[in-house]
Amino acid sequence: SSAVVMACRAVKDEEEIRLTQKAVTIAEKAFRALMNEGARFFIGKTEKQLSAELSYRMQNLGADRQSFPNGIIVGSGPNSAGAHHVPTDRKVRKNEPVLFDFGALVDGYCSDVTRVVFTGRKIDPHLRDIYHLVKEAHSLAIKAIKPRRKASAIDKVARDHIMQGGYKEEFRHGLGHAIGMEVHEAVRFNQTDHTPLKKHMVMTVEPGVYIKGFAGVRLEDDVLVTADGCRSLNKLSCHLEKFILT
């Protein structure tokens, strides 16, 4: 059955890990190059244009294509509050957040990364607080990952932290999912999946807080479960200051 196939696919071999790592590296390299263009490059462009631009850059670096069925997510300003926002013709403005959820497909394996950039130094203090809360939840969840721990227990670590920060309904999806030949594979970091983690599973960790009409923050890495913990396949930091475009 497909459940059996998915269970087998959850644990990756060395070659699968290598290809997933390559997919992460290419995605991040393309995103870094895009950020290096500076705020001026972003301001005035539509979400659709930025989505296409990042997709093109990933392919230019050797990706087969971007890894999502519906394309790269780009949500600017209040649109960053849509957890699965489809890019529109809205033009990016100065001093606002732009959420990018993107990934590359390389030789059949996917990556899935989310970062938020800011098109100027004026960041709403409320948004800054949300960013730091999400970053802490992201980091705590990664520290909690180890073999034999239940997937649901990892979700709880991040969810509890976000709840203590005053947000419950605003974190409106699971913490993450297995990734491999498909972007979303069977094992999920959510409240109902009690699958014990195993060495060499590759999982996303993507806490988020979304305030309708205001903004949203999600930070996502792809992590490899190791013998005694986990290792992030990402090199791109989550430090807010690094994502302020000048």
List the predicted regions and their residue ranges.
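Active-site neighborhoods and metal-handling regions in enzymes and metal-associated proteins
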Residues: 1-246
